[in-house]
């Protein structure tokens, strides 16, 4: 039986570009470690999340992009100010898939963006 959720891994095409995107969302780099001569793993976390969950960004030497498939959808992160988060991302050329919206009248405000490798990230501001 599983006892703890540890991390989500994304395979990325360029380390610094992906790290910068997640830093813009508030993630911090926890550790960067080479895996022999095959890959580099960068573990990132949000302040206050403790040891887990972590986002693992894996760069495999010699691979520029990956087929994302259709089964996976997104990760979700809470933001304190959705408008200012989107403004900061827009400066870097990252725009929402569609304008922010609420799923119910008093519900959270949400929108989706894509990271530099095309992975969807849901941004959620409490209602």
Where do the language-model regions lie?
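Core segments of cupin and vicinal oxygen chelate
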Residues: 2, 9-52
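Short, charged/polar, Gly/Pro-enriched secondary-structure boundary elements
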Residues: 49-53, 118-121
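Short, charged/polar surface micro-motifs in flexible loops or helix N-caps
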Residues: 48-51, 62-64, 82-84
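Short amphipathic alpha-helices within nucleic acid-binding modules
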Residues: 21, 83-88
């Amino acid at each position: 039986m599983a006892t703890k959720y540890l991390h989500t891994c994304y395979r990325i095409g360029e380390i610094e570009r992906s790290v910068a995107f997640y830093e813009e969302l508030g993630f911090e780099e926890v550790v960067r470690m080479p895996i022999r001569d095959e890959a580099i793993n960068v573990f990132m976390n949000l302040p206050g999340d403790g040891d887990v969950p972590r986002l693992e960004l894996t760069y495999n030497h010699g691979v520029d992009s990956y087929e994302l498939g259709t089964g996976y959808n997104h990760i979700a992160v809470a933001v304190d100010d959705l408008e200012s988060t989107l403004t900061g991302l827009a400066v870097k050329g990252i725009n929402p898939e569609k304008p922010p919206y609420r799923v119910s009248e008093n519900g959270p405000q949400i929108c989706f963006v894509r990271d530099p490798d095309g992975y969807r990230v849901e941004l959620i501001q409490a209602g």
